[in-house]
């Protein structure tokens, strides 16, 4: 493993093949446009290249399709053992992300449990918001729960504010 290189695990990337499996021609077009014939679920891929596929799905097929890809992530990506409650699942999303992406500045997911029925998730992982929301939906669905309704516009605005704050902090750090 080259820790200087940002990489994304094929098992997580493979979620789009599974989620869009009913539309094989769409999957084949996405793969061809990305310059590959297939996604190997056991291989590591360039992080930015992999994330660009998710953006392409959102751009060409739409946000609902990308959310479906995110929901499928729990079936194809590596998740740590012992996630036997919704609270453990949410708290484990950051670790799960680190099992599927590696290298500098790939981000993470931080969960703060507010009480027995609510949590706050901070996603610094790069990628489309709808993918992240789909991952959250798929994770919650494992336990018969559904995340509260958040609009894509709210998530985009929060991400924009977060990136602006990160830039401000970097500018003042010695």
Q: Where does each model-flagged region fall?
A:
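N-terminal accessory segment detector
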Residues: 1-114, 127, 151-154, 158-163, ...
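Short, non-transmembrane amphipathic alpha-helical segments
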Residues: 130-147
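Short, well-ordered coil↔helix boundary/capping segments
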Residues: 123-131
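Short, aliphatic-rich beta-strand segments
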Residues: 117-123
